[in-house]
């Protein structure tokens, strides 16, 4: 791509996308590496940017991979496109006023930090689509 005359910042931008889409949370440092590569390419320019790009490419190529975040956002967006705007469940709504409290906003909300391992079994989706799962951390890698 470099020898073909492709813009170096375009190459670096594609590396950021690859780090997020193809590697994701299997190695979150890959995203940082790719973003730093993009910034360095913008500062350094030719001809030395080829070395920076090479370092980033080899790091990304040898990293563990996971596309679960990419798949999760696709599934979530497909659900929204299918169902349209659905109301936020009442227990997730903020209740800064007496009226909102009287309307049951926030009632029954479980604050994860008050529970073991900062995890709570709680439905976060609207009733019409409750039970759907877009991401499974067990299958992350």
Describe these PLM feature segments.
Residues 1-119, 125-141:
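Terminal-proximal interaction/regulatory segments of ATP-powered molecular machines
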